[in-house]
Structures are given as structure tokens and as C-alpha cells.
């Protein structure tokens, strides 16, 4: 877990791990490989292995795409499953994240914040990552929904063998979710 006050660089660290930002110094290793000096094309093979769950589920989902298209986009690009199995695979991921299959053809604006964050989680998990960077995944949600999402993340971590870099300003949340 990564804990710190607002503005201390927690999100920058998460995005730097993904090479969305270039570091000023230091090195980042993943599975024994140093990532900071990899080119864009060399980094491509890590795009499915490392995923990010954004802080704000309201702005991180494309409004003109259906839930099914949002989750399946990377599945198709990275050939996670054969084309004829994509819809069924995506619906299985949706179920794991607490989203009924009938949400497949609906749009993000039709959902609450908690449901949108479940869509974001499903999108991240759809490519079978080894590492998921959770950038304050509950800070934009109502307190009543925060516990549900944290419990979902913990359950998915245990059932799928996920490793999280959990970023938060709330020490108790990080303590609960981390090993």
C-alpha cells in the first residue's frame, strides 16, 4: 500500500509504474525487469500485466461506449480470448465484479458511482493482470458504497491471486486491503 497526504505524489507514482509518466530518477522493476528505460513498443507486453483502477469512476469511463464495449476493448486488442468467446468472457468478469449480464449493453451514465467503479474494476481485470494499481478507488464514492468496493477488491484479490499497489490517504483502508 501507498499512503500519503493529498498532493504528495501517490497518483504520480502509480502512473509512473505504468510509464504514463516518465520518472525523473530511480528505477522501477516488475518481475525482475527494469521498466523505466523500455521503449513504448517494449512496454507494450506489460500493458496487460499491469492495470490501473482510476480514482474517479465518473470521468474514467467513455460515455458513448456500452459497458460491454468498455470491458471488451482491451480483451480484443490483446487477444485474451477468441473473438467468438469475448461477450461470454466479459459477462463472466462482470459477474465476478457484481454486475449482472443485462448491464452489458447499457451506458455509464445509467449507473451509480459504485456500479461505475465495478465497471472500472472489471475493465482492469479483463486482461488477466498480475498487478493492479488501485489509485484511491473509493475516494470519490459515498461512504456506504466504499466498504462494498473495498470488500469486492479483497475478494477478487483472494480468488484471482491478484497483487495490488493500493494508493490511499486512508491508512485504515490500506491496512485492511494489504497483506
Positions of predicted regions on the chain:
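Conserved ABC transporter NBD signature motif
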Residues: 26-34
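Helix-to-loop junction immediately C-terminal to a conserved catalytic motif
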Residues: 18
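Hydrophobic anchor residue at the start of the ABC signature
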Residues: 71, 121, 149
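ABC ATPase NBD coupling module
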Residues: 35-51, 77
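Conserved ABC ATPase "signature" region
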Residues: 34, 85-102
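Conserved ABC ATPase signature
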Residues: 107-111, 115
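A short, proline-enriched helix->beta-strand linker immediately N-terminal to the Walker B motif
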Residues: 126-130
Amino acid at each position: 500500500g501507498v499512503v500519503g497526504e493529498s498532493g504528495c505524489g501517490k497518483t504520480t507514482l502509480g502512473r509512473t509504474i505504468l510509464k504514463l509518466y516518465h520518472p525523473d530518477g530511480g528505477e522501477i522493476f516488475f518481475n525482475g525487469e527494469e521498466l523505466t528505460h523500455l521503449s513504448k513498443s517494449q512496454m507494450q507486453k506489460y500493458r496487460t500485466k499491469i492495470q490501473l483502477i482510476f480514482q474517479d469512476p465518473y470521468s474514467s469511463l467513455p460515455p458513448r461506449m456500452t459497458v460491454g464495449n468498455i470491458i471488451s476493448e482491451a480483451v480484443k486488442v490483446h487477444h485474451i480470448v477468441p473473438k467468438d468467446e469475448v461477450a461470454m468472457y466479459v459477462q463472466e468478469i462482470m459477474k465476478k465484479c457484481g454486475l449482472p449480464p443485462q448491464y452489458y449493453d447499457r451506458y455509464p451514465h445509467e449507473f451509480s458511482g459504485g456500479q461505475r467503479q465495478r465497471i472500472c474494476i472489471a475493465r482492469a481485470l479483463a486482461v488477466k493482470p498480475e498487478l493492479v494499481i488501485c489509485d484511491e478507488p473509493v475516494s470519490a464514492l459515498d461512504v456506504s458504497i466504499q466498504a462494498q468496493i473495498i470488500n469486492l477488491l479483497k475478494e477478487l484479490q483472494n480468488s484471482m491471486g491478484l497483487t495490488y499497489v493500493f494508493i490511499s490517504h486512508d491508512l485504515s483502508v490500506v491496512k485492511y486491503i494489504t497483506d
